[in-house]
Amino acid sequence: MKATMFLAGLAVASAIDNEDLRPSFIDWTSKHGKSYAGAEFEQRFQIYQSNHAYISSHNARHSAGLTSFTVAHNQFSAMTNREYRNLLQKKNRPRSAGAAASFVADQADPAPDNFDWRPLGVVNPVKNQASCGSCWAFSATAAMEGAFNQKHNGTGVPSQCSSYKCGPNDTPCCSFSEQEVVDCTLNGADTCNKGGEMHDGVLEIVNNQKGKFNTESQYPYTSGGGTSTGQCNAKPATAVTTGITGYANVTHGDEKALKQAAYEHAIISIGIDASQNSFQFYSSGVYDEPACHNTIDQLDHGVAIVGYGIDTSPSPSPGPGPGPSPGPGPADCPDQNTEKACKADTGCFWCNDPGIGGFCFSFPCGQEENNHGTPFKRNLLTAGSAGPAPSPAPSTGTDYWIVRNSWGESWGMNGYIWMSRNKDNQCGVACDSIYALM
């Protein structure tokens, strides 16, 4: 009898607790532009409650030090995991069919421990595929943008791209049309509901468009509502001549090679397994999901690597925060004015410029500006300069990839996720990775 009364009490308490979430759910519908009525409202509210319970449970484990990342409500809060997975529309066709090359590491320019292309004016703001399964097109376009913007380095950018700026210094850059890739690749066969492959998107621009690519404003994204016409409306007469000639594969399953490729070739297009609830609601920290698959046949989402680093913080702070910036802050290193003192300070880098001399600062040579405001961009270092300094002392922190998603800035860390690196190719990050060639 007492047990029955206790269970009944739990049921009532649970109902009251769940009902307390109704205002939160109503706020969520308003924030995300959702409109539900009648039975559908109650159904979505039930799903929201279930997801809320998962989020609360996971974050309690994080507070107890049992997991390295947090989760939070986002645009998927009223979706079941099955509905969410339907948005993941990366296909897995053989990636080697049209590769023009395979990655060969530059042994003379080894990758530093931390690197991030975002401060260098190469990476566009995070975009949003919305309800269309077009992740593959966003991933492929990001790789082509990365190659183009890296080569131009803010100079000689075509007039069609005059409205685009990248990075904290508003570096002139180009932003290309994902809608063109969706509509034109394989004659429009890869619609929102059928998915596609990143390398096919690159080959569409190279082979069928002859290297010409419309900008985002010339050919705007219209498939966010979940539909695409499959009608190619590319306008080659006004498109940018990109100089993109193909794509290169990075060695399957080799995270060391992937790190070097990410350092040398800006944005890397990759496929991952993003099917878990934990990815659906990821908020901050290094994503470490043992249930993630690491085989190429189970990759279901296309994203882009824009850098990598080592997390040395004792525990991630919950909730979304600013975009990740590996290494100490800009003011941590300039006082180390000798090469010996700089190299002895973990996280600081000694870099030389032929016209100015050596300086110590908190990002790898070629990634930031020194305290005199002189840019040390890798591809601008003149002959005879020191180039990247030796890596700092090994850290006991967690290795991660800086991954740019295409679900808008409200997801994750302003649209980004730190994914585990050097952890048995977790989530298949190194299974299907390519970069654009110029």
Model-derived features: where do they sit?
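Cleavable N-terminal signal peptides of Sec/SRP-targeted secreted and luminal proteins
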Residues: K2-A15
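Generic structural signal for beta-strand residues in well-ordered domains
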Residues: M5-A8, Y263, Q298, A341
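Residue-identity detector for glycine
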Residues: G9, G319-G323, G327-G329, G384-G387
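Short, flexible beta-strand-to-coil junctions
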Residues: V12, I272-S275, C351-G357
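Secreted, propeptide-processed cysteine-rich mini-domains
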Residues: P110-P112, P324-D345
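Extracellular Cys-Trp
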Residues: D335, A341-F376
